[in-house]
Amino acid sequence: MESLPKTLSTLARLRERDITLTFATGRHALEMQHILGALSLDAYLITGNGTRVHSLEGELLHRDDLPADVAELVLYQQWDTRASMHIFNDDGWFTGKEIPALLQAFVYSGFRYQIIDVKKMPLGSVTKICFCGDHDDLTRLQIQLYEALGERAHLCFSATDCLEVLPVGCNKGAALTVLTQHLGLSLRDCMAFGDAMNDREMLGSVGSGFIMGNAMPQLRAELPHLPVIGHCRNQAVSHYLTHWLDYPHLPYSPE
C-alpha cells in the first residue's frame, strides 16, 4: 500500500475542485463502504457491477436483482465446470466451501465469504452469481449458461478468472447513467477508467474513457478508439489524474 498516500492526495485535489468521485466496482457495497470509511473518502458507490448505487451518505439510490427463477436455475443446475460458485446479496458473499486463495484480493478490507449450502440460499434477493476458475473452463461454462438462460441474464467477465451472471441490462454504464441523472449531470461530463469487460459499457458511454495497460485483450478489441494508459501496478489512474490537474491542455504520456 506504499502508493496509497499519493493516490489519496490526488483524490483530495479532485474534491477540492468540486469534482464528484464515484467508485464503480464489482466488489460488494459492504466492503466498499468499509474502505471509504477507513480512508475518510467521500464518494458515490456503484457496486456489484451495477447492481447497487449508493449516495455519499450511504443511501440506496438504485438496486437491481436477479429474477428468482434465474437465480434458482443457476444455483440448482449441474454445470460441467470445475469453477467455484459465489452468490451475493445485501447481506454479503456466500459460497459452498473454503477457498482461501480467493481471500488474497481482500486482505486490505478483510471482507470474506460466508460458507453456506448454496441450495438453501434465499432466491428473492440475489444480486449476482459469480464463477471463479480457469479462463478456458469459464469460456465453456459461458456457453452453457447462455444456452440455459438465453436473454434472461447478462453474462460478463469481470476478470479473466471470474464470470458473472447479472440482471439483464445491469452493468456499470447503466448504473452510472442512473447516478448522473440523479445528480443532474451528463455522461459526457464523466471520466472513467477500466481494465475488464465489466467496464465496457461504462467506458464506451462516458465523455472520457481510458483503458488500463493491464486490461483484458477483449476490452481493447471492443473499444479500440479509446486511449490506453499505464498499468494499475504503477498507479496509472493517479498518474493520469495528476497530469490532468496540473497540465490539462498538454498531451499525456504514461511514461
From Swiss-Prot:
PROSITE patterns: COF_2. InterPro entries: Cof, HAD-like_sf, HAD-SF_hydro_IIB, HAD_sf. The keyword Metal-binding applies. Its cofactor is Mg(2+). Its EC number is 3.6.1.-. It is an enzyme of class 3 (hydrolase). SUPFAM superfamilies: HAD-like (SSF56784). GO terms for molecular function: magnesium ion binding; phosphatase activity. It holds the Pfam family Hydrolase_3. PANTHER family: HMP-PP PHOSPHATASE (PTHR47267:SF2), PTHR47267. Belongs to the HAD-like hydrolase superfamily. Cof family. This is HMP-PP phosphatase. It comes from Escherichia coli (strain ATCC 8739 / DSM 1576 / NBRC 3972 / NCIMB 8545 / WDCM 00012 / Crooks). The lineage of its organism: Bacteria, Pseudomonadati, Pseudomonadota, Gammaproteobacteria, Enterobacterales. The gene is cof.
